[in-house]
A protein has these predicted regions:
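Well-ordered alpha/beta subsegment
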Residues: 138-141
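Short amphipathic alpha-helices and their capping/turn residues within compact interaction modules
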Residues: 28, 32, 62, 66, ...
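Hydrophobic core segments within long, regular secondary-structure runs in both alpha-
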Residues: 24, 158-161, 179
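C-terminal regulatory/linker segments that are acidic, Ser/Thr- and Pro-rich
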Residues: 1-11, 15, 19-21, 166-241
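Catalytic and GAP-homology cores of small GTPase regulators
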Residues: 1-131
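Short sequence/structural elements of tandem HEAT/ARM alpha-solenoid repeats
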Residues: 120, 155-156, 173-176
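Amphipathic alpha-helical oligomerization segments
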Residues: 79-82, 132-136, 146-161
Length: 241
């Protein structure tokens, strides 16, 4: 997500969601069983292929024509699954919001921040979830606290990550590991922070992402009809929520 390729490119949330849907659809078609699927250290991850994918996305942004879109689709079809995951991370890392903060001299400063899930929304939801006795509907309550466009993107990401976690016996991507790989992409990394502050933010974001993922999985398990087959591994993942 933090590659130097097109690092200054920013994506509108609706545009990012459209790319996320296309990329994850292709990953699903290829399968999510590959070991270290979400890892940037995966042996089969190709830097050159990832750069081509990123350039294809940028081309569709700068020249939104049918030809550019077709070229991007061709890149999707021929890329390996690890490069597609790298592209997914890049897309999520390009979502930014401008916020107003006060400096030490009380001067109002406009600051660019990454991540798309507001941290304060998450913490208030977490506190309310505890008061409500950890209802199986808690994920739905989180979605209702978010802007519609944010909720749509979070749903798309969680739907993909839940599939990945369900296949953790093959890809080794447990909910905890998923949280570590995607936490900063959901909540963003602090700007100009010390190592200790950045690491603390990483741990918080990782744990929060794992929490949301398990809440998502638990909600959908509770909504499944009695006759619907659910993988035993999925049931075990949410047993101790």
């Amino acid at each position: 997500g933090y590659t130097g390729e097109a690092w200054d490119e920013l994506l509108d949330m609706e545009v990012a969601t459209a790319y996320v849907m296309r990329i994850t659809a292709r990953i699903r078609a290829l399968g999510v069983d590959e070991p270290q699927l979400l890892s940037s250290m995966a042996v089969d991850l190709s830097a050159s292929e990832t750069r081509r994918l990123i350039r294809a996305v940028v081309a569709t942004l700068r020249s939104p024509t049918a030809e550019a879109d077709k070229a991007f689709d061709e890149e999707l079809q021929f890329a390996n699954v690890h490069s597609l995951v790298a592209l997914l991370k890049w897309v999520l890392a390009r979502i930014g919001t401008v916020t107003a903060v006060r400096s030490g001299s009380e001067t109002l400063v406009m600051r660019q921040e990454h991540g798309f899930v507001p941290w304060m929304t998450y913490t208030s939801w977490r506190a309310q979830e505890g008061k409500d006795g950890f209802s199986t509907l808690s994920y739905l309550l989180l979605i209702q606290r978010l802007e519609k466009r944010t909720a749509r993107l979070l749903d798309a990401v969680m739907d993909f990550l839940a599939l990945v976690a369900t296949h953790s016996a093959q890809n080794h991507m447990t909910p905890s590991k998923v949280g570590r790989y995607f936490g900063m992409l959901l909540f963003g990394a602090p700007e100009d922070a010390s190592f200790a502050e950045t690491y603390a933010a990483f741990v918080r974001a990782s744990n929060a992402t794992e929490h949301i993922l398990l809440a998502f999985m638990r909600y959908h398990v509770s909504m499944a009809k009695a006759r619907t087959y659910l993988p035993r591994r999925l049931l075990r993942l949410v047993d101790d929520y």
